[in-house]
Design a protein with these regions (language model features):
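Active-site Tyr-X1-5-Lys
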Residues: 98-126
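Mid/C-terminal beta-alpha module of Rossmann-like enzyme folds, strongest
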Residues: 178-245
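Short alpha-helix in the Rossmann-fold core of NAD(P)-dependent oxidoreductases
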Residues: 53-58, 74-77, 104-105, 165
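NAD(P)H-binding glycine-rich loop region in Rossmannoid oxidoreductase-like domains
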Residues: 17-56, 60, 64-67, 82
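Short, small-residue-biased leader/transition segments that mark boundaries at the very start
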Residues: 2-7, 203
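Conserved Rossmann-fold NAD(P)-dependent oxidoreductase catalytic core, especially the SDR/UDP-sugar
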Residues: 60-100
Length: 247
């Protein structure tokens, strides 16, 4: 079916998870909550925004589930709780987040876990930690990368073999639905990225091939970029992703 048919069968209600959730729709204990709400772009927001939305939002979503006796939650976290590193991470790896976003998502995971533990024999919690999610209409990292290549504004920052853990949005959704149907009570935690992960060069070259782009992408020394980021970042560069953390 086309997307138009899908949209016609949905009901959309504006809801701010930073406040108590009160929605005027029928809710039953058999409903399932998919908690996707988050402030996520890093950098791009004041530190407080990550904590206010991601932590308080988790508290309010879990309170809503508690109020109506909902037994199943699927929560999208992130690989950000692992911190910035390129060594292989498993679900058993100790999280060491080093950004407000990563810290807030790890705390949100724990809030959901506490909700499940209150009635561990009845409640089902699935936590997924996706990498960069891409797909039609995402207007995120991959979309910006494409337009950067097309406009001649993208370059390799210091190296071409930077690992970019990622997953296609429909693959992620299929996996979440599969686990929802094949998971009883308890807590499940999954990293959701392609393995082996792709390098930025592989992603760029694949994108160029798929779209017919003939652009040459050059590599700029990391030391030069770091100097520029330290200067430009405080002057408004963070809004464009130009800061030492991104380099």
């Amino acid at each position: 079916r086309g997307l138009g048919d899908v949209y016609k069968r949905q009901t959309y209600i504006n809801c701010d998870v930073r406040s108590e959730i009160n929605i005027d729709v029928p809710v039953t204990s058999e409903d399932v909550i998919f908690n996707f709400a988050a402030v996520h772009r890093t950098p791009g927001h004041p530190d407080q925004a990550y904590f206010e939305t991601n932590i308080r939002g988790a508290e309010n979503v879990c309170a809503f589930a508690e109020k109506f006796g909902i037994k199943k939650i699927v929560f999208t976290s992130s690989i950000a709780p692992y911190g910035a590193a390129e060594d292989l991470k498993t679900e058993e790896t100790l999280p060491t987040p080093n950004t407000p976003y990563g810290i807030s998502k790890l705390v949100a995971e724990k809030i959901h876990t506490i909700w499940q533990a209150k009635k561990s024999n009845e409640r089902q919690l699935t936590i997924v930690r996706p990498g960069v999610v891409f797909g039609k209409g995402e207007n995120g990292n991959f979309t910006r990368l494409y337009w950067g290549i097309r406009g001649g504004k993208f370059f390799y920052p210091g190296r071409k073999d930077t690992i970019k853990a990622c997953i296609y949005v429909k693959e992620l959704v299929r996996f979440m639905l599969y686990r929802l149907e094949n998971h009883n009570e308890g807590v499940e935690l999954y990293n959701c990225t392609y393995e082996p992960a792709f390098t930025i060069e592989q992603i760029v070259e694949t994108m160029k091939k798929a779209t017919g782009l003939q652009r040459t992408v050059v590599e700029v020394p990391g030391s030069l970029l770091m100097t520029v980021a330290r200067i430009v970042g405080p002057l408004g560069g963070k809004a464009l992703g130009i800061c030492p953390a991104r380099v």
